[in-house]
């Protein structure tokens, strides 16, 4: 019994995701960035979704909600805190709620920061987390609606998941994130090696996702605020971890 994943590109850099319970065939779509790309993925796989799991209200994640709901009769599930901004929402969920996709269960983790109501769907048995625009490969989402401490606490929740957790993110930002990460953590050998692999993947037109939590904790500066070398690079040897996070986010915003 597994959760099968089909990841595909939407718009310019969004990821679309179909997640199928192999035992029952029940399929969920994670966010709805673009109708046409999603329809092509459904046709290609033969996986017809009955659920749409929404992580947050931004237009590039909900644009196709209503069209897909009309076509497939989808049940749309999303964050209660953003319900008024999510077209067609049927079920509002909060921290700790459980969402079933066939025989697979996802726990809702509230991960505000990018938006005030952003959520992550964590499938514990499958070892998969859909973090959308909270945690990226080598990055984190911009803080449009929250202050840095809010996102910092959300990331602290995510790093409590098992290191082998497979992370699916909302965008293909990894190559630019790698360049920034190297600017603040240039002596990190794991990061330097990873950056080379990322460059090669993108040169071939291949995606850099999914990643794993363990890989992110070794190379993602936003998850390494405690690291003495990184702190020293920033001139923040004695600062609180949350202050280090805020400084890294500030630098990334203008990088």
Curated annotation (Swiss-Prot):
Q: How would you summarize the oligomeric state and partners of this protein?
A: Monomer.
**What does the entry comment about cofactor binding?**
Binds 2 Zn(2+) ions per subunit.
Q: Describe the reaction catalysed, as an equation.
A: an S-(2-hydroxyacyl)glutathione + H2O = a 2-hydroxy carboxylate + glutathione + H(+)
PANTHER family the record matches: HYDROXYACYLGLUTATHIONE HYDROLASE, HYDROXYACYLGLUTATHIONE HYDROLASE GLOB
Q: Which cofactor does it need?
A: Zn(2+)
Q: What does this protein do?
A: Thiolesterase that catalyzes the hydrolysis of S-D-lactoyl-glutathione to form glutathione and D-lactic acid.
**Protein name as catalogued:** Hydroxyacylglutathione hydrolase
Q: Which residues bind Zn(2+) 2?
A: 60-61, 133, 171
Pathway participation: Secondary metabolite metabolism; methylglyoxal degradation; (R)-lactate from methylglyoxal: step 2/2
Question: What family classification does the UniProt entry report for this protein?
Answer: Belongs to the metallo-beta-lactamase superfamily. Glyoxalase II family.
- SUPFAM superfamilies in the cross-refs: Metallo-hydrolase/oxidoreductase (SSF56281)
Q: What is its EC number?
A: 3.1.2.6
Enumerate the NCBIfam families for this protein: GSH_gloB
Q: Name one GO biological process term.
A: methylglyoxal catabolic process to D-lactate via S-lactoyl-glutathione
Q: Tell me the superkingdom of the source.
A: Bacteria
A Pfam family this chain is assigned to: HAGH_C
The scientific name of the source species is: Chelativorans sp. (strain BNC1)
Asked whether the keyword Zinc is assigned, the reply is yes
InterPro entries with a match to the protein in the record: Clx_II_MBL (IPR035680), Glyoxalase_II_hydrolase (IPR050110), HAGH_C (IPR032282), Hydroxyacylglutathione_Hdrlase (IPR017782), Metallo-B-lactamas (IPR001279), RibonucZ/Hydroxyglut_hydro (IPR036866)
* Positions bound to Zn(2+) 1: 56, 58, 114, 133
Which GO terms label this protein's molecular function in UniProt? hydroxyacylglutathione hydrolase activity; metal ion binding
For this UniProt record, the keywords arranged alphabetically read as follows: Hydrolase, Metal-binding, Zinc
